[in-house]
Regions:
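Divalent-metal (Mg2+/Mn2+/Ca2+)-assisted nucleotide/phosphate chemistry catalytic cores
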Residues: 70, 76-79, 90-145
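Conserved small/polar residues in nucleotide/adenosyl-binding loops
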Residues: 151-158
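Glycine-rich nucleotide/cofactor/substrate-binding loop typically near the N-terminus or early
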Residues: 36-106
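General beta-strand structural signal in soluble alpha/beta enzymes
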Residues: 9-10, 30-35, 50-53, 78, ...
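Conserved active-site and cofactor/substrate-binding residues in soluble primary-metabolism enzymes
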Residues: 2, 15-19, 32, 36, ...
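N-terminal glycine-/serine-/threonine-rich phosphate-binding loop
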Residues: 1-31, 37-50
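Short, flexible, solvent-exposed loop/turn segments with mixed acidic/basic and small polar residues
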Residues: 18-21, 62-68, 129-133
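Flexible loop residues that form catalytic
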Residues: 12, 104, 158
Length: 160
């Protein structure tokens, strides 16, 4: 079971996002979300906090930079040691113990498009970085990268 109730959602593939988001709200999670994910959650009336509101930094460069921020990566990479938690508190950083992240469809775009600019925009930077940070801190941070795994998350959270 996830110890902390803050989840970061940053997905390109929104398959079943409505169901898992509603489930997380019912389980008393606070959802933080980026760009298109935030727009989607707003459209389906799921309460959440835009990540740019939390970081106090708007998305820049046409959305190329959304999650690359110490308030996000600090919350993912911190352990529950007193030292880390003190530092988070001093910097007003929350713990993220659950991430729901999937990547831009780079390979599909390469197969379908001959336009270099279109292909380049599908090179995911922030998503890969979020995944790597969560993996580095695997003892604390749970990451879901495929909508198929939402059922596993539901089962895990329901059993606790």
């Amino acid at each position: 079971m996830v110890k902390n109730k803050n989840v970061l959602i940053s997905v390109f593939d929104k398959t079943n996002l409505d169901n898992i988001a509603i489930f997380l709200i019912k389980k008393k999670f606070t959802i933080y979300s980026t760009g298109g994910s935030s727009e989607y959650l707003k459209k389906i009336h799921v309460p959440h906090i835009q990540i740019s509101k939390y970081t106090e930094q708007k998305e820049i460069l046409s959305g190329r930079v959304k999650t690359l921020h110490p308030k996000i990566f600090g919350g993912i990479l911190a352990t529950y040691s007193k030292k880390h938690q003190k530092e988070l508190s001093e910097e007003k950083i929350i713990n993220f113990d659950l991430l729901i992240v999937n990547l831009y469809p780079f390979e599909e775009t390469v197969k379908k498009s001959k336009k270099t600019d279109e292909i380049i925009e599908m090179i995911d930077i922030g998503g890969h970085s979020l995944i790597r940070a969560a993996v580095k801190n695997y003892r604390k941070t749970t990451i879901i990268i495929d909508p198929v795994s939402y059922t596993h998350l539901r089962a895990h959270e329901t059993s606790g």
